[in-house]
Amino acid sequence: LNKIDYKNKKDIDNEPMNHSKKTVDRFKFINAGGNIQERMDELPDELKISNFYSRGNTMRLDMNSLAPTLVPGHSNFPVHPIEHRSITVREAAVITGFPLDYKFVGSHTKRCEHVGNAVPPPLAEAIAVECVKYLDGLDNNKRAIAQQA
């Protein structure tokens, strides 16, 4: 996250969500690497939430640990490791290996879905490299067979 230019106000993918005060207050209870489920008993009555919401998917990133698999949708993005807000589209994209200048299109919700549904670019690249090696090997085998004939 330290590679992101937070001063660039033109990057709409780095605009944080406008959370309600209650949501922000709930986020304050989540420890780094933890989730809301771990702190349910400590929430004041006015911050209590349904069991559906508290399944444990509202978790805070830990700067010293690997990020979890991100899933589609802004409400599924984890809480920022330090700030009391969900991570931005840009932060989610950087975590999954997108280049810093990658541009997402569509509504905020669609851009979140694009990141959450994407195969992480470094993984896609590694798969592509192996596919090329395999296909090159097939070509080499065909050449060897043709030369033997």
PLM ranges: what are they?
Residues 1-149:
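C-terminal target-recognition/interaction regions appended to catalytic cores
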